[in-house]
Each structure stands twice: as C-alpha cells, then as structure tokens.
Amino acid sequence: MKSYIAVDIGASSGRLMLGQQKRGQLTLKEVHRFSNGFAMKDGHDRWDVDHLIHEIFKGLEKVKKMGIKDVELGIDTWAVDYVLVGENGHKLEDPISYRDKRTHNAIQQLTSDLPKEYIYEKTGIQFQDFNTLYQLYKENHDLLAKTDKIMMMPDYLGYVLTGNAVTEITNASTTQMLNLRVGLFDKDLLGKVNVSQDQFPRLVESGSVLGNVSHKWHTQYDIPEVEVVTVATHDTASAVVGTPGEGDRWAFLSSGTWSLLGTELNVPENGLQAFHENYTNEWGAYGTYRFLKNIMGLWVAQCVRHELGDQYSFGELADLAQQVRPFQQFIDINDERFTNPENMIKELQDYCRETKQTIPETPGELFQAIYSNLSLFYANELNKLDRILGYHIDTLNIVGGGSNVALMNQLTSTLANIKVVAGPSEATAVGNIMVQMITSDEVENIGAGRRLIETSFDLKRYLPETNKYGDILKEYQRFLTNKSKEMV
C-alpha cells in the first residue's frame, strides 16, 4: 500500500496529511499541524519560511514513527508570494506577505502607461494589488539585482527539500505575468518590473516528479525516504482537483480564508465581459483553466472570532448566527477595507454606520452578517458567471472549511436557486494527494480520481428553499450598484 503526504500550508496554519487507498476508498489522516503567520520585520510583514521547513521535517519524523519507510510528498501553499534566492542558493531575505501594504496603489501606478485591457488579454488574470506583478513592481531594485532566482513559495520549499528548482504552472499563473497564448512568462510584463525570464526556474506541469529529499536532511532528521512530486502547488488548484465535480454544468467554491468561486474550463475566457467583471483564468492541473472570482472569504470571520478572544468555536458561532434574522444589513464583503484592518469588528460596524444600516453588536449578529453577506455575494457572482459563460450552472460544489457551515450553504443554495454539494472539507489535501496518485499510476486520470473522491467522503447536499427570501438578492444587487456609483 502506497503512502502519500500532502503538505498543505495556508496563511494561518499548515499540516501534513497522510493519504492511502484502502479497499477502494481514499483515507485521509492528519499527521502534524503547525501555526503559520506573518510578522513585522524590517518594515514589512514577512513569512518565516525556515519555520515552515522545520515543521515539514517534524511532520515527516512523525510519519516514520508510524512505521512508514517511504512516501510520496507534494507541497501546496497560498499563491502570489515568492522568495528571492541569491547566487549562493540561499534566500536573500524573509519573503514579504501579500497582505503587506507596500503594493497600495501599485496597480494604478503600473497601468498608467500600460492599459489594463492589454495586460488582461495577455494573462487573463484579475487585477488584485497583491499579485506578484505588483509586488515585484514595488520590490527593492538593489535586491532584485542580486537575485539569481525568483521562486514561488511552494517551489522554494520543494527546492530546499530536494535541491531542484522549478516553477509549477498553476502557481506561476497567479503572478499575472504568464502569457496565456505561449505558456511562458511575458517578456513585456517582466521588463516592466525589471526582472528577466532567466530569473525564474523552468516551468513544469502539475504532476512532475521533482526528486528525492536531499541526503543532508536525513542526517538532521529521522525521516523516511521521500520522493517529492510537484503537485498543483497553488492550494486552490489542488482544491479544484479535490472537488467531486458533481453536476452536468458545475461550479466550485473553495471556501477558506479566501473564497474562490468559478468553474473549470478547457479554454480560457479572457474577453471584455470577463475583464470588466474582474474574473481570472488561473491555470489548473492537466491542461485546464480555473475561471474564477477571488472573494474575501472566511478571513473576515476568522478575524472577528479572534477579536472575540477565540472563546467560541466556529460551530458555536454558526449556532448563534442561526438564531439571528438574516439580511439586516448589506455589506460588500469584498471591499478592500476588509483586507487587513486594525480591528475587523469595528470595520464592519463602521461600514454599517456609514451606510446607515443596522449595526451588528453580538457575536451572533456579527456572524449572521458575515455569513448572509457572503452567501449574497456568492449568489450574485453565480449570476454573473451564467451571463459570461452563456449557460446556467446547475450545481455548486463547495469544498474547504466553509463546506462545514450549513447555514451559509443553505443560504447560498436558496439565493442562487442552485443545488449545493458540500465537501470534502479537506479538498486541498485530497487534490494534492490525487495528483501524486495519478503520477504514481495508482489512479488512471482526473475523472477516475473524482469518482474515487465522491465515494470516499461524506458529502452533504442542499436544495433551494422556494420563495423564502423574496427579492433580497435583487435588493443586494441594487445596493452594490448604488455603492459603486457613489465611489465614482
């Protein structure tokens, strides 16, 4: 029986998950969990990548103690962040987080003489000020001059483990520098941010074998033999691989710190309508494109829970929210003001105060406001998706931590008038492992993999509740339209 390890690292935590196929079902077990987060250092919010590497090896030591002598391993992380590596093969500094404020106004500055339409036609990627393109635009020029290689976060971790450097395609696409037509980094855009093609390791597809963990690590840690596979290294790309894909015309919602809502396409959709709606065409595994919208997601809920002293579990907060009447206020949950405020509760309350709406005060009111407005935002985006694609999405597959929030799943189903399939909650780790299984020939292809996922995990299904909330979605859409007009 083969053993697979998914190293799945998010903005606030990471874990090592053990995957094995037993009696025709995929089993998943958490082996090791650790904290992650950025901290202010030398004037910027930075990641401690040395901590991440140490925790990966601590997890692998636990794997060996389980009696497992050799494993496959894949690494996925969040997107857009990178590590600058010098000619000596070591990082030049701790990498800066995408939530750092250095890229404020970077889009406006870079596009002052380079039209947005031109960039979108080339890359198909939505405009977000933390994209790698704008981070590099704001990067220290002296530091870039010393840089031998620019490595995306999961590629850097794989490089440290094996000594082999590559740039995996799904994460590379999120940089907003990968040319859709030629499948290479775009020279014009690279020139705009003073970097060269040679500074990026070679591009590889998901499922490429990277190599074995270097011998030196075996002298420092008591770990099994490990072969590293370059999986779909962007965590959302792995989550989409780990989506059951139920329905004839299905969409996915990867619901975690960020919410990524979209569908899987065989050809990119980078026309003017997609551009104006700020949809993105991120590259997926096995020749696909993830046509999606990036939404603030459960970050807002995570911040509020923390500001409440972490005294409630998310389950308890969902129960409290269930007791509160929904839609007492409309909130554009994707507003940039919620990206990294000093106090999220105050920011939500100020927003409601400024828009002359009911102010949420109690934990239940705050979480009802968050969940109901996320559901409204999802339903609104599903309507847009239908219009752009020219057909109706019939099923929404919700994966990730948000798939456990029954209140939000049911609201989304009702508001969007769509069937919702929730689960697996660990879709990112599942997708990470599935790519490894396909590479090792234990699973034939992505279709067979998704059938295995559907029969291996307990999925919950939600159907719309007829006429329950009247025209609330139209009222929300009018609110967003009026808000946009006020900002012009």
Swiss-Prot record:
Pfam families: FGGY_C, FGGY_N
Residues annotated as the enzyme's active site: 235 (proton acceptor)
Pathway: Carbohydrate degradation; L-rhamnose degradation; glycerone phosphate from L-rhamnose: step 2/3
Gene Ontology MF terms in the entry: ATP binding; rhamnulokinase activity
Domain of life: Bacteria
Keyword field contains Transmembrane: no
GO biological process: rhamnose catabolic process
Binding site for ATP: 11-15, 257, 302, 401
Residue numbers binding substrate: 79, 234-236, 294
TM ranges: none
Keywords, ordered alphabetically: ATP-binding, Kinase, Magnesium, Nucleotide-binding, Rhamnose metabolism, Transferase
Root EC class: transferase
HAMAP family on file: Rhamnulokinase (MF_01535)
Family: Belongs to the rhamnulokinase family.
Function (record text): Involved in the catabolism of L-rhamnose (6-deoxy-L-mannose). Catalyzes the transfer of the gamma-phosphate group from ATP to the 1-hydroxyl group of L-rhamnulose to yield L-rhamnulose 1-phosphate.
Protein name per the record: Rhamnulokinase
